[in-house]
Amino acid sequence: VYFFESTTAAWRDLGKWMRSQGVLVYYEIQRMYQKEFPKYLKCMKESDIVKFSDEAVEDLSFVDELKEKLVIQTLGAKGVRFNLRGGGWVTLPPVQNDNVVDTEGCGDWTTASFINALGKRGAVKFSDLTSEIVSECLMEAQEYASRNASYFGTKGIITANM
């Protein structure tokens, strides 16, 4: 898996090349600025998976242009949803946590855990992705993100388990 989160042409071009080599390319939008939308769209088009939070991206009209992608939108305490190959949004419930201390880093835990879960299932190419696999992997990823929210900082789980 090749992961990138910058709109810089060099990272996007590397993603394009990696994708041409059969590598699963994952692009994460940290914050979308409308005036730079063309840069974001180029990055999305060179990726297999596009992830963002509901806080980072408000206007989802571009999703219709991503029919051959997996689009993931995290919804905070409301869970997560995804759109695989333009098949419509599938919403997954949140993993409950009654001891939320800090949500910093939960998006990173979602991403890392999702990629790890895909690998554990042997889903290393875009053609391997099904709604069932994506749902299972996102639920597993939410478990880690939810657990991380019980601790302070982006590496809460790591420091708590030392």
Regions of interest found by a model, annotated:
Residues 1-93, 122-128, 132-133, 152-161:
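Ribokinase/PfkB-type carbohydrate-kinase core domain
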Residues 96-162:
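Conserved post-catalytic alpha-helical subdomain immediately downstream of the catalytic base
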